[in-house]
UniProtKB/Swiss-Prot annotation:
NCBIfam families: fmt. (6S)-5,6,7,8-tetrahydrofolate binds at S114, L115, L116, P117. Attaches a formyl group to the free amino group of methionyl-tRNA(fMet). The formyl group appears to play a dual role in the initiator identity of N-formylmethionyl-tRNA by promoting its recognition by IF2 and preventing the misappropriation of this tRNA by the elongation apparatus. It comes from Azobacteroides pseudotrichonymphae genomovar. CFP2. It catalyses: L-methionyl-tRNA(fMet) + (6R)-10-formyltetrahydrofolate = N-formyl-L-methionyl-tRNA(fMet) + (6S)-5,6,7,8-tetrahydrofolate + H(+). One of its GO terms (cellular component) is cytosol. GO terms for molecular function: methionyl-tRNA formyltransferase activity. This is Methionyl-tRNA formyltransferase. Belongs to the Fmt family. Keywords: Protein biosynthesis, Transferase.
Length: 324
C-alpha cells in the first residue's frame, strides 16, 4: 500500500507529537484525521479556550479533527470508523481502549520515549536521567491490552550527556521519534516489519525500571542523597516540573525554592550537617550532601523568575539561612 493511498489517523496532544505529525505530512502520507484532547479553559473566568499543540497544527493544515471526552463514546467511535482508517499512529496521547486500537486494518502503533521494555509509563525521559542512565531512545510498538507492552517494531537510541537535562533530551527524542514514526509507517505499509516481543526476562544484569507519572511531592530534593544522585535528580526534572526544596529564612519562614541546574562543588567543612548552605552571598551557593557538596547554578524562588545564582544573590542573599 502506498503512502498516498493508505488512510492514516494520528492521535496526540503536546509539542512532542507535533513533530511526528509534521514529518508524516511532509513525507506525503495521507493523514485523513487527527484525534486530540478536548480544549482546556484558561483565564480569570475560565472563558478562554486553550487548544492543544496538535489541534493548532491540524487546524492550520485543515485536517479533520475529533476531540472526544470519552474514547468509548458511541458518537466518537462512529465518527472514527467513518474515516475508514488503515493505520493509526499514536504519540503522547491517552490510553486507548481495544475498540479504538483494534479498529484499523493494519493496526495501531505508538511512539514511546524510551528503549522498551525499560521505562514503561508516563515519564520515561525524566526517570532515565534521574536514574543516571547513559543512553535512552525511542521505540515504536503495536498497541495491545497492557500499557507499553506490545510487540516492538523499531528502536533508535542516543547518549545522555552529562550536560543534558529533561528538556534537551525531550527535544532530541522528539525529532528522532518523528523520523522513526515515518520509517515505521513506511515499513508497515510495505509489509517489511519484523516484530520483536518485549522480553522482560532477557535484560541480563539490568533490573526492569518503570517511569510513573511525576507528582509534585516526588520532586522534593532529598539532601541525604549523594551529590551525583541529587545532580541527576535535578537535571531529570529540569526545566519541568522542576526539583524543589524549602528555603528557610533567618526569620524561620520557609519558601519553596526550585533548582534547575547544578554541578559538583569544591569541598568545604565535612563536619557540616546535610542540607547546610555555604555561600559567599555574591557568586556561589553550595549545599552539603551525603558525600560532599553540590553547587547551585540556576534557581527560582517562589513568586520570582528563574535566574542564575549570581543574579539571585544580588537581591536575595539576606534570605539564606544555615540549611535547606
Amino acid at each position: 500500500m502506498t503512502a498516498s493511498k493508505a488512510r492514516i489517523v494520528f492521535m496526540g496532544t503536546p509539542d512532542f507529537a507535533v513533530a511526528s505529525l509534521d514529518a508524516l505530512i511532509g513525507e506525503g502520507y495521507n493523514v485523513v484525521g487527527v484525534v486530540t484532547i478536548p480544549d482546556k479553559s484558561i483565564g480569570k473566568h475560565q472563558s478562554i479556550p486553550q487548544f492543544s499543540p496538535i489541534k493548532q497544527y491540524a487546524l492550520s493544515h485543515e485536517i479533520p479533527l475529533l476531540q472526544p471526552k470519552k474514547l468509548k463514546d458511541p458518537d466518537f467511535l462512529k465518527s472514527l470508523k467513518a474515516w475508514n482508517t488503515d493505520l493509526q499512529v499514536v504519540v503522547s496521547f491517552r490510553l486507548l481502549p481495544e475498540v479504538v486500537w483494534n479498529m484499523p486494518s493494519l493496526g495501531t502503533f505508538n511512539l514511546h520515549a524510551s528503549l522498551l521494555p525499560q521505562y514503561r509509563g508516563a515519564a520515561p525521559i525524566n526517570w532515565a536521567i534521574i536514574n543516571g542512565e547513559k543512553e535512552t531512545g525511542v521505540t515504536t510498538f503495536f498497541l495491545d491490552y497492557e500499557i507499553d507492552t506490545g510487540k516492538i517494531i523499531a528502536q533508535e537510541c542516543i547518549p545522555i550527556k552529562e550536560t543534558d537535562n529533561a528538556g534537551t533530551i525531550h527535544d532530541e527524542l522528539m525529532y528522532l521519534g518523528a523520523k522513526l514514526v515515518v520509517k515505521t509507517t513506511n515499513d508497515i505499509l510495505s509489509g517489511t516489519v519484523k516484530l520483536i516481543s518485549q522480553d522482560e526476562t532477557n535484560l541480563g544484569k539490568q533490573k526492569l525500571k518503570i517511569a510513573p507519572k511525576i507528582f509534585r511531592e516526588v520532586c522534593k530534593i532529598d539532601w541525604n542523597k549523594t551529590t551525583r544522585e541529587i545532580h541527576n535528580f535535578i537535571r531529570g526534572l529540569s526545566p519541568y516540573p522542576g526539583a524543589w526544596t524549602e528555603l528557610t529564612c533567618v526569620k524561620g519562614m520557609t519558601f519553596p525554592f526550585k533548582i534547575f541546574e547544578t554541578e559538583k562543588a569544591d569541598c568545604h567543612d565535612y563536619s557540616l550537617p546535610v542540607g547546610t548552605i555555604v555561600s559567599d552571598k555574591k557568586v556561589y551557593i553550595d549545599v552539603r550532601t551525603k558525600d560532599g557538596f553540590i553547587r547551585l547554578r540556576n534557581v527560582q524562588l517562589a513568586g520570582k523568575k528563574r535566574m542564575p545564582v549570581t543574579d539571585f544573590l544580588k537581591g536575595n542573599a539576606y534570605l539564606l539561612s544555615l540549611h535547606f
